[in-house]
Amino acid sequence: MEIKRALRNSWLASILACSSACLCASASNPPPLGETDAALDLLLTRKAQEILDTHRLRESKPLGASVSASVDISQRKMVIRFGPGVLPLEDDHSLEEMEQYVRNTLEAYALQAGVGEVEIVVLYEGRLYWEHFPRSVFAPLQAVPRQAGGSVLVSASHGLLRTHPGLQWEFQRPERNGILEDLITPGYADELAQLLTDRANLTVHRARRGGNDIHPDSMRPWKEMSARYHLKNLLPERTDIWHHFANSNRNDREVLDDIRARPYYANHLGVDGMLSIHTNAGDPVARGSRVHYHPSKPGDRLLADLTLCYMREIINSQDGYVEFPVARSGVAAGHGENSFATMPSVVVEVAFHTNAADAVALQDPVFRTASMKGVEKGYRLFREGKGCVPLKAEPIDGIHLPAGGAQQVDVVFEGYPQYPIELVTTNVGCPPGWKCTDSRVRIERPGAKPSQVTLRCENTGSAPIYWNTQVVDDDGVKSPPVPHWVQCIRGPGSAVASPGVHAGVEAATAG
């Protein structure tokens, strides 16, 4: 602990020495209980204040509103406290981008300081944001009863929107590291939609429209447009869905319409779930996958956790992504996209387009497929009432075999692999002068054949043979290898193979 603290203090000192920002934290907030680090809290507060001030300048609002941040290191909990004057007059989503940027940046700094992943609580004048705006989703918005067959809304983030008063058409996010979030997320949503159809047998609805045909008002392809305009075209009479902020005079009021339209459309459809696909933004040091659920819907946390569980399992199984960071648990955050949805819903932040390494991953089809397979699997197993169970094979006992003998060995595993699977047995210790052959047993579907490998001794000598066996599924997920051994025994005569050895199954052989 002392070494970690010394390293953290050294890192913080170097950061603080380069910072000349003014500390604007409120002195009225009491320090949190538990282990604290004053230098870390100072750094986090300064970074949060910088982001808040930048946001208020962009919004043409006066400076002076304060924010502070502190970390309880022993509990791994960060509290971000916004002071008076920050909240809008109505719940209009105008703080979402700023709050998320603060969260992501401070989380990354805490991680760099050696604190590890932290739970983050954001308070506005001492209360959670949504507690300032009690809400209920109006029943008329859910026009279609939910069907037992299963349906889901997949919502790719952002898209072109009209800004006021000049009525220019603009993308909602700036380009960073060669990525425009508005244009890259539809490809992820396409992949996810196909997986949900093929693997989960669900009816998939889309918030944004694809295709190269032209949106008549902007004269841009429909695939570039935000959900607001697709829903206006699809449901012209439902202004309550796509024009919620009709009375707003904000320049970005159609941005706010777009955020609110997505959950309202999900409610209208009566789907069973809503999956929103985004790329993330923050300080360039922030990276990795996150999944957000709304704090007013704590039941959605399980969906967020399962989504991350299986994103991690599949992403980290791909070459080049073994150490790609995926958060351990879902984040409670106030996104309008899922706070107004009546069904389980999460916001999936696939990776950070503001981080150079993540940006490279986001443009890689291997990463895109792996991440969306994880989202689909998490949602499917959530619907099936299953949990986070990474693929793992149980221990395999060693066996003794006479020369010429063979025995089938059960490979018992836990988890939910994507079939077909292979049981892969690899030799890791072969006696000098012997020939040891690896084996692969392919199982097309659950129950198609016993989960067994055949081990064989063909040499007339006596020696121990060492093997590793693992389960490999169709998504490339590999269970950790299980070591086991076979003791080949010299003896008169030859043994007969155990009953039930299947023809065509390649045996792991030593001889």
Descriptions of predicted regions:
Residues 449-461:
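Short, hydrophobic beta-strand segments
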Residues 52-83:
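Short edge beta-strands and adjacent turn/loop segments
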Residues 245-257, 316-339, 391-396:
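Short catalytic/ligand-gating loop segments at beta-alpha or beta-beta junctions
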